Structures are given as structure tokens and as C-alpha cells.
Amino acid sequence: MLILLPAIAIAFLTPHGCWAGPETKKDRMPIPIIKAANGSAEGWQPKEWSGKARYEVIETEAGSTLHLSSNATSTALYKEARFNIKDLPTLNWKWKATKLPAGGDVRKKSTDDQAVQVYVIFPRWPEAVNSRLVGYIWDTTAPVGSIVTSTKTSNVRYIVVRSGEADLGRWLSEQRNVYADYKKLFNEEPPEAGRVSVMIDSDNTKSAAESFVAEIYFSK
């Protein structure tokens, strides 16, 4: 996993230096996955950290779906979502992994690869490096429930939601209280959320990975 905090945070700025995102609804805020004319995800900004993973929007039994595949690459997609996480604290999503990076283990820098990662990003200005990221991951090796600080920067914290191949090939519905998780991980009140990210990487292990993500939304 390759995450460069300053580069990520700077990329979140609009041309006028302001944060932008969808209007929050009273009880629910969807993070739309819409197929663009070229097959990519409309409104999602790609960032290729190492090589170029394949990503596209397809229709599955879970609805409009992000399909990601990696062969020794590392790629993230970002979607603006500016809101107070305390108002809509619950992140909901569906995901499916069909191939995990061989030997991936978030606890070690040399094997820090996952088939699928879902992040909520909290910008902190004026110093971009201060931005906080809460990541929910499907790891190959680390046990479910593991809380891990990134081996590259302390401002990125992970919670292992799924691990190993037991549920490979199955759609799984997830739900996390991001507000509570942020407070637990960083021991502080969260600032305004800025973006959501979906990522796949298998560059450190030089292996392959494949995953699917659908129906992302925040709720009370």
C-alpha cells in the first residue's frame, strides 16, 4: 500500500481552494457509483500510486459496482463527500473479493497489500500532512479486528474488517460507525469529512488481486 498524505490532501482541493462534496440528506447520503461514457466511475478521481490497476463500473447483483483488479500495482479512486461525520456517522457498503494478494499483511511494510480498502478521509489544514485517514480493509493475513497504524505515516489507521479466503467470492454487507472509530483511533473529535476512497494494491507483494465494491452510503 502506497499512500502519500500531502499528495492526497492537495488533490482534494477544488480550484478555489475549498472543499466540495454532495449535499447531505437528513438520514442518508449516498456515494454514487455511476458508469461514465468510457466505462470508468463518474465523479471519482483516480490516483495511480504504482503502475496502473484496472477499474471500471459494471452491473452486478449488488447493483452499480466498482470492479478493481491489480497485477503488482496500486491504485485509488476518490469521491468528494464533505459533511459532518457526527451527523451521519455510519458508513455502509457492500464488497466482494475474488483474489487476495499472496502473502499480504498490513502489519508489515514489505507486504502491505490488500484486495480492497475503503477509506474515509478527514482533511486538516493548513498542513496537508495532518490529514487523517480511517481505512477499512480486507487483508490476506492480519486477523479480523486488528487495528493497525500505517507503516508509512501515523495519520493513516486501519481496521481489518475481513481477513483471508473464507468469504472469497461472496458479497458481504458492512457497517461501521466512523465517528466512533475515528475517536478510538485518533483519541480526538473528528474534523469534517472530505472524501471517500476505494483502493486496491498488490505492488509490494508483486502479486494479483481483484475486488468489487457497491452501494456506499452514510447514514445515522
Q: What is the predicted function of each stretch?
A:
Residues W19-W49:
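Extracellular carbohydrate-recognition regions
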Residues E56-A76:
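Short carbohydrate-recognition loop motifs
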Residues E80-L91, E165-L168:
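Extracellular/lumenal carbohydrate-interaction signature centered on repeated Trp-anchored short motifs
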Residues K94-L100, P123-W125, Y179:
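Solvent-exposed strand-to-loop "edge" motifs in beta-rich extracellular domains
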Residues T111-V156:
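Extracellular/luminal beta-rich ligand-recognition
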Residues D113-V118, S154-G164, L168-S207:
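Extracellular beta-strand ligand-recognition surfaces/modules
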